[in-house]
Amino acid sequence: MEHTLPALPYALDALAPHISKETLEYHYGKHHQTYVTNLNNLIKGTEFENSTLEEIVKKSSAGIFNNSAQVWNHTFYWNGLKPNGGGAPTGALAAAIDAKWGSFDAFKEAFTKSAIGNFGSSWTWLVKKADGSLDIVNTSNAATPLTTADKALITCDLWEHAYYIDYRNARAKYVEAFWSLANWDFAAANFA
């Protein structure tokens, strides 16, 4: 099965001024595409050749895992952003956030602190635990909640290529911009 780069759910310039068109051209058009290309090359002639992306992520290791997980993580990340996003979630997700952190502002502060402090090339996730509660989880490199019992709700990509064009080494400014793009409808659908 040939894997393809999923289409973005918005135009390349739609996240500006928070994330520039140039960043998306590189991050989506080059980095994400390279993971797809590498994955297709690596799975030829293997047990994963006809597997879905999720099956590959859950069952593979080494280079195949790294590339398949990065394809999945990036696709999830793009869907977790939207033009004119931000604000706060409503409904059941908002209630679950309040139950865990006391308020959306307290959650936002905890997520931001976790993301800024997440060392190196990494991801910070809001996840739903098996018991239905929420948590903030940091992963390194290509690691993903898809391989655990946690259900990913939304993520912030903290690999340097996600923000270096726009923010250089100012990760905190990038994380601040993330809050203006967060797609709470996507997160709520994942929570349901």
What is each model feature region?
Residues 1-192:
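Feature for soluble, non-membrane regions of globular proteins
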